[in-house]
Amino acid sequence: MPYGIYDLTHNQGYVYVGNSYDTPEFAAYAIAQWWADADRPRFRCEDKLLILADAGGSNNCRYWLWKQQVQEQLADQLGIVVMICHYPTGTSKWNPVEYSLFSQISRNWAGKPLCSWDIMLNFIRGTMTDTGLQVKAFLVDRTFEKQKKVTADERAALRLHPRPICPTWNYVIKPRPCTG
């Protein structure tokens, strides 16, 4: 299953294709891998990250595991503040990752049999547009456990700050202080 990241500023797509399960842990892992990619373009202020995400799927706005994994893999490990804005159900067609990245990938591989990881990755990497879209693709050969649970103590330990408008869909996760 693919997890896509679209950099609006640089018109670049990054697709992480997992051979395990589409889980919140996989979604956060893909974003952390993108952030760590030495070849990705840099931004002036890299102490914050804005994620525009669908309300469903592995980055579901109701999943505590998604929030916990963002806390651990992004905010804590990378030392960044992460603001997440979810698109309401049924509005994902307005999400740039859908109309600027996945729609182009779908056109590129339309009607082609995707019978191996290499073929799939090469079609994703070969996706380009007249506006200069470039796409990188990576295979994530790792098992992500389904149905992991987040305990009440783990929830309480999150540095989760809901935003005033639509707090279920818009929130900030801040790094926790290092304990040593």
Question: PLM features: what roles do these ranges have?
Answer:
Residues 84-106:
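RNase H-like two-metal-ion nuclease catalytic core shared by retroviral integrases
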Residues 30, 34, 65-70, 100-105:
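Alpha-helical scaffold elements adjacent to nucleotide-binding pockets in ATP/GTP-utilizing enzyme cores
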Residues 54-66, 88-94:
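Acidic, metal-coordinating catalytic cores used for nucleic-acid/nucleotide bond scission
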Residues 111-180:
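C-terminal accessory extensions appended to soluble enzyme cores
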Residues 1-52, 56-57:
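Electropositive, glycine- and tryptophan-enriched low-complexity nucleic-acid-binding patches
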Residues 48-55, 84-89, 123-124:
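Extended hydrophobic secondary-structure segments that form protein cores and membrane-embedded regions
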Residues 76, 103, 107-111, 126:
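Short, well-ordered loop/turn and helix-capping segments at boundaries between secondary-structure elements
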